[in-house]
Amino acid sequence: MTGYIPTLEQIDELHRKIAPSEAAYELVHTHCVIVATIGCQIVRRQNALFTRRCTLSKDAPERGSNRRTENTVDAAVSATPMPPTVGVTGGQVPPRLLDEHLVLIGGLLHDIGTYRVFKHDGSDGEPLKFSKKRYILHGLKGYEYLLDEGVDESIAQFARNHTGVGLTCEDV
């Protein structure tokens, strides 16, 4: 690790530092909060499945059997699924517990580069508008910004990789 893992307060400071206007901050930061919230709900569900993996019935749909025969499809339909976790249903048992805090930080920072691809950034009172041509660059712009600010690569990669940039065929 060569950089720092930002706290929630530092994440807000990173957003405010790069935001060209209050309107831009409100749009991008609110979106990031929504994504982080949904991500954390999914992780809680996955971790609940992992924690309860020993008590799930063998035919529970959350076990995610890769073999699909007529009998297993019938069994999966008739099996009792695990009750919802924080309003989330479905999913499959992950191979290990997932890091909810990492998902929270990644979700809050994943779109931080969008501040650098506005065509109209709201600073002059005009409505916000993204540059369609440059929008694909927002992941790389966010990655570079976070690294320049001293954020660790393990966190900065959330900005870079959520658009697919930086992923190899093997990663996918």
Predicted regions and their residues:
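Acidic, low-complexity proline/glycine-rich segments
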Residues: 1-7
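Amphipathic alpha-helical segments within well-ordered protein domains
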Residues: 15-16, 40, 44, 140-147
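Active-site flanking loop/helix segments enriched in acidic
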Residues: 7-31, 50-54, 67, 117-130
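Divalent metal-dependent catalytic cores for phosphoryl transfer on phosphate-bearing substrates
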Residues: 96-172
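Alpha-helical phosphate/pyrophosphate-handling elements in metalloenzyme active cores
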Residues: 24-105, 148-151, 156
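Short amphipathic alpha-helical interaction patches enriched in hydrophobic/aromatic residues
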Residues: 18-22, 43, 163
